[in-house]
Amino acid sequence: MFSGIVQSLGTIISISEAGEIVTLEVQATEDFTKDLKVGDSVAVDGVCLTLTKSESDRMFFDAVPETLSKTLIKSYTKGTKVNLEPSLKFNDSVGGHIVSGHIHTTGHVNQVEIHGDAKDIVIDAGADWGKFLFEKGYIGINGCSITLGEITEGRFIVHLIPETLRATNLDNLVYGSQVNLEFDQSLSLIHISEPT
């Protein structure tokens, strides 16, 4: 589990394929990597991945076809900036909302408005996902816990403050950019339990 508060920005150093498995090499600060060990879970742009190898400031992760089909990983190239968060430990504070690292779908940026050092970003998740969105609720965007603004069917707006833009890759979003989306898990459970 994760808090949705990005702890560091990483950079994709290499991407390799072996059969259906894609291996990511991610560079981060040594301050971020120093306490990690093989087998630990790390959210990479909100995707829960298992650390398979660590070398100083480098981390290695494997992604399987199911993960590749639902996330941005398949579109990564060398130099891509990714949001990083280690998994929560007992007694850690939760500054955002609990996220699982299991991405539901990807959305695309429909509009970006700049307001001084802040930005309003409109994201289209698709009409089928509209039932998981409600104003002032939470959503995970590339692993960031964000409060939802206005909603129209499967399209929503988020208001991003300067600190969020400084600390995450959301500042790099432009029209047409793709993002990983994780909807509020409590809403997912409610809809799963509804009679059909």
Where are these regions (language model features)?
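Conserved loop->alpha-helix
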Residues: M1-S193
